[in-house]
């Protein structure tokens, strides 16, 4: 009987509150993320300080978002939509979007498909062209 050596399944498990895991990126002043890559999708756990505003941007990848903690305003396709803990949303590829955290800040889980190449390494920025607010 031949047993092939493989990675433990435990390596596929993470916790949104464990700040010591993931690929770390700074997305803007008061906005940081931890990235977890798979072959077909990517998870980004974003921490946004109170009242911080993310830059409006777009990318070709589809993006799902889940508000884990806090509240804010999602700016998407030119609309401003209030979001709170438990809300989730879809941002189709190439749609301008951003976020403004509420007075208590926010923690958001974003899921990208396919994975964003720009996020596969630590660093800063969104890795895409930033749009000027209208």
Predicted features, each with a name:
Residues 44-58:
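Conserved short histidine dyad/triad with adjacent acidic residue
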Residues 61-72, 77:
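Glycine- and acidic-residue-biased ligand/ion/polar-headgroup-sensing regions
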């Amino acid at each position: 009987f031949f047993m092939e050596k493989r990675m433990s399944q435990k390596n596929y498990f993470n916790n949104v509150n464990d700040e010591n895991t993931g690929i770390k990126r700074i997305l803007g002043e008061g906005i940081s993320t931890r990235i977890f890559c798979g072959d077909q999708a990517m998870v980004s756990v974003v921490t946004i300080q109170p009242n911080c505003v993310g830059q409006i941007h777009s990318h070709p990848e589809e993006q799902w978002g889940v508000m884990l903690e806090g509240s804010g305003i999602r700016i998407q396709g030119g609309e401003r939509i209030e979001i709170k803990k438990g809300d989730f949303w879809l941002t189709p590829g190439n749609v301008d979007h951003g976020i403004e955290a509420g007075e208590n800040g926010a923690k958001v889980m974003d899921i990208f498909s396919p994975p964003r190449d720009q996020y596969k390494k630590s660093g800063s920025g969104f890795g895409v062209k930033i749009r000027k607010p209208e």
